Amino acid sequence: MVQLYYGSDTQNTHRVVQETILPLFKRAGVAVHDKLIPELCDNDWRDHDFFVLGVPTWYYGELQSDWEAYFDHFKTIDFKGKTVALFGLGDQWGYDEWFIDGVGILAEALIANGAELVCPWPTKGYDFQKSRALKNAGEFYGLALDEDNQYDLTHSRCEAWVKLVVAELDSRLTSIPLAV
């Protein structure tokens, strides 16, 4: 089962998770357990191996408030043997120097603590100046969504990215619990 953990202040991330990402996983036959960041406990990380993490970026490259409050603890978690796919929301035109920096902030901590990051996303089709979320010149560490300027692309981007995540699961697991 996939564990999907995320934070959301304005409900944009929550809406994308509930109305788009979770239904896409269900349609693919993948069981997903979702939780908001304030609901997490240490067992949520210890007892599972495959995670999808969602983070909107705020203001000038800052973490969303739940992630910000949790981040000092997050940086202490041992992610060796854990697989993580990331997605983030940001505003590539209004905050073009910090586009989805939250993804990069999480990625840095995850890599430092042994996680394997999967399902990077191409930078093609975005217009921004800088981002901490860049894995390399052509890829973000995870899916980049812009509900402010490219909301019309959210569903198709999520659809393509969820297919990548499902393929990654298929390559790792002998059986995926089916959604009920």
Stretches with model-predicted labels:
Residues A28-C41:
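A short beta-strand-loop structural module common to alpha/beta enzyme folds
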Residues R27-A28, D47-V180:
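FMN-binding flavodoxin-like domain, especially the glycine-rich phosphate-binding loop
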Residues V2-L24:
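N-terminal beta1-alpha1 ligand-phosphate binding loop
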Residues L4-Y6, K35-P38, Y70-H73:
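Short acidic/polar alpha-helix capping motifs at helix-coil junctions
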